[in-house]
Every structure is written in C-alpha cells, then in structure tokens.
C-alpha cells in the first residue's frame, strides 16, 4: 500500500506537512506575522524518520545546512526516528507537557488525533496564501513551489476538517529488486511477472550451503535471499492480489479472514528456513543495496 507522508506543523513558527509543538509556553492560536524578523534568533525542532538509513539522515542534515545558510538566524534541531508509529506516540505523549516538536513528519490520519488538543496543530491556509512567505512567496530565499505546482490529490490529503494542517512531503512506493547474477547462477530465468511461488522457490534454492556453512551461490557465510521492507504493506499487497479484504473506507478491519490465515501459513516455512526476512528482523533493505 502506498502511503502518503506529510509534514505537520504543531503550533509553532513553521509550516509544512510537519507537526510541531509549543514547548513550555502557553498555546495560543497561530497568526501569520506581518514580517519575518531576521534580527531575531529562532530555534526549530524537527522530528523525522530515517529507517536507520544513514543516507536519509545525511540528506536531512544537508537540507538543514542549506536552509540555515539562507536563514542564519534560524537553527533546526533534528531528531530522527526509525518508524512513524514512534513519532506519533511521542507527539501524543508530549502534547500534555507542551514539549512537542515544531515540525514533524506524519501520516495525514495521525493529524486528527493531534487536533484533539487545543491549539496544538497549526492550520496553515493563511500562511500558504501569504504573498511574501507562503507557497511561491516573493520574499522566500529559495525557489518555493506554488500551489499549482503541487499535485492536487496530495494537497487534498492535507485538508483535515476545516482546513490544511500539513503540506505534502513524499509519496512512498515499493519495487521488487532482483539480483540477476545470483538468480541466473541458480539456474533460473527472470519472468516478466514474478509470482510468489517463483520468489519462494528461488529463495529456498539460494539457501544451499556446503559442509562449512558457506552459501554456494555467493561463497559467503551470510545471505538473505529475500527481504521485504514493510510487512504491513506485504500483507496488504498479498490480500489485494487475492481479491481479499483488508479494511474499508469506513474504518472497518477486515483482514482477519481465511485468506489471511492461508497467506501467513504459506510464509512460515520460509521464515523458519531464514530464506525470508524483514526490516524488523534484519535491517533496512536499502542498506544492503548501498553496501
């Protein structure tokens, strides 16, 4: 399932599909200032997800460095998380003590929960429309996108209740990467449309070892034939492929069915043989691609 990631702004200085908090100050309704005071020092806390991927962390750090070079009176404090659920829980926990971040990455459906607090999340419609500092603003020191340059469907997902409370950050997707050299070495061709039966068969074939525990296909003592980043998405995709339900638009949970049980039982042997692993068990799959 492709999930839409947003930056939510919690009552603070910034706007974007980020969630931000007040800290120890009394929360008051946000108003767009007439001017940006460049003589005043600002400190912004930013909570982001990086999947333990140092490449992502370095991208955040570089973006922050570039931003601070343009705005030397703004200092961004980055805190990274390995999953969205922990960010979500930490924001909720910190709302009570006014120690939420100024900006954070979130899913749109998390925003409704944050809104239960008074003046916790900033409605940013006025800021988006501001001719100076809004979308495509004339006084921005960088080439900011105009509203017309944002995919309308993505922006619509940031409209929660009575207005916009976030800006689009990224749309995730998934792809199947195949090590052609290893698969060919095992004696298999790569089909135009790989099936689960094909994936499991090739993965099990790759598990063959010699007497010393060395994998025959790569000559090493370590091998993960098949790894999936998100087991949530894996289940959603497998149910979709079998025309089986997962949930509906009204929020009903439908995944507890015979097809789900069948899928789980089909995966068990490959988990036991260790021909299959996940992000939670091993690591971020991209780390292996970058190795």
Functional labels for PLM-detected ranges:
Residues 1-44, 69:
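Short, low-complexity disordered leader/linker segments with a strong preference
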Residues 51-53, 83-86, 109-112, 172-175, ...:
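Solvent-exposed loop/turn segments at secondary-structure junctions
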Residues 80-90, 196-198, 278-290:
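Short helix-initiation/N-cap motifs at beta->coil->alpha
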Residues 34-36, 47-49, 56, 62-64, ...:
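Extracytoplasmic/periplasmic substrate-binding proteins
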Residues 31-32, 36, 108-173, 215-216, ...:
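Hinge/lid segment of periplasmic solute-binding proteins
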Residues 57-64, 88, 92, 108-111, ...:
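Extracytoplasmic/secreted envelope proteins and their assembly/folding machinery
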Residues 41-43, 53-112:
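Early extracytoplasmic/lumenal segment of secretory-pathway proteins
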Residues 69, 79, 125-131, 156-233, ...:
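Helix-loop-helix "hinge/cap" segment bordering the ligand-binding cleft or interdomain interface
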């Amino acid at each position: 399932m492709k999930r839409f990631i947003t930056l939510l702004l919690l009552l603070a200085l910034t706007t974007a599909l980020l969630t931000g908090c007040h800290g120890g100050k009394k929360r008051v309704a946000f108003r767009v200032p007439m001017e940006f005071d460049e003589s005043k020092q600002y400190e912004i806390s930013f909570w982001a997800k990086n999947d333990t991927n140092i490449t992502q962390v370095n991208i955040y750090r570089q973006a922050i460095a570039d931003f601070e070079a343009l705005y030397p009176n703004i200092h961004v404090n980055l805190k990274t998380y390995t999953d969205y659920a922990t960010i979500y829980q930490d924001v909720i926990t910190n709302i009570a003590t006014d120690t939420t971040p100024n900006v954070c990455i979130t899913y749109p459906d998390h925003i409704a929960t944050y809104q239960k607090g008074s003046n916790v999340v900033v409605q940013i419609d006025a800021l988006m429309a501001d001719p100076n500092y809004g979308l495509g603003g004339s006084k921005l020191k960088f080439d900011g996108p105009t509203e017309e340059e944002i995919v309308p469907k993505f922006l619509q997902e940031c409209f929660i209740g009575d207005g916009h409370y976030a800006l689009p950050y990224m749309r995730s997707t998934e792809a199947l990467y195949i090590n052609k050299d290893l698969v060919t070495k095992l004696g298999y061709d790569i089909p135009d449309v790989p099936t689960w039966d094909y994936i499991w068969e090739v993965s099990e074939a790759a598990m063959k070892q010699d007497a010393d525990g060395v994998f025959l296909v790569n000559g090493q003592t370590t091998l993960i034939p098949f790894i999936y980043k998100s087991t949530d998405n894996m289940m959603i995709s497998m149910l979709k492929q079998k025309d089986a339900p997962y949930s509906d638009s009204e929020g009903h949970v439908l995944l507890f069915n015979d097809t789900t049980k069948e899928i789980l039982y089909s995966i068990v042997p490959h988990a036991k043989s260790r021909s299959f692993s996940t992000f939670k068990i091993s690591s971020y799959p991209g780390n292996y691609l970058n190795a």
